[in-house]
């Protein structure tokens, strides 16, 4: 659980980095239009403004234009090797920005696999 002090530090850092270049987080029109490389299996999906997501985004120096966009936390790519469900036992999503490794994926929409 994120402590109040860690959240306060992250919020301060987030405010300090507000001058950084905004990230484009456009969402796909429909889940069936999701590029295979954008399909992720995330242990948690929440709004970017939520405590844990805001903390991670702040520490990474990421400034979003829309703080209500969905982000995935602790994600891994969905592969067909995992079986009929694509190997996802958590939340399957299509995310526009997966450039932060498994830590966080930005601009996510739920998909059915």
From Swiss-Prot:
Glycans are attached at residues 35, 97. Its main location: secreted. One of its GO terms (cellular component) is fungal-type cell wall. Disulfide bonds join 34-94, 41-88, 42-75, 95-108. InterPro entries: Hydrophobin (IPR001338). GO terms for molecular function: structural constituent of cell wall. Keywords: Cell wall, Disulfide bond, Glycoprotein, Secreted, Signal. Coiled coil: none annotated. Residues 1-20 form the signal peptide. It holds the Pfam family Hydrophobin. It is found in: Secreted; Secreted, Cell wall. Aerial growth, conidiation, and dispersal of filamentous fungi in the environment rely upon a capability of their secreting small amphipathic proteins called hydrophobins (HPBs) with low sequence identity. Class I can self-assemble into an outermost layer of rodlet bundles on aerial cell surfaces, conferring cellular hydrophobicity that supports fungal growth, development and dispersal; whereas Class II form highly ordered films at water-air interfaces through intermolecular interactions but contribute nothing to the rodlet structure. Belongs to the fungal hydrophobin family. Self-assembles to form functional amyloid fibrils called rodlets. Self-assembly into fibrillar rodlets occurs spontaneously at hydrophobic:hydrophilic interfaces and the rodlets further associate laterally to form amphipathic monolayers. This is Class I hydrophobin fvh1. It comes from Flammulina velutipes. The gene is fvh1.
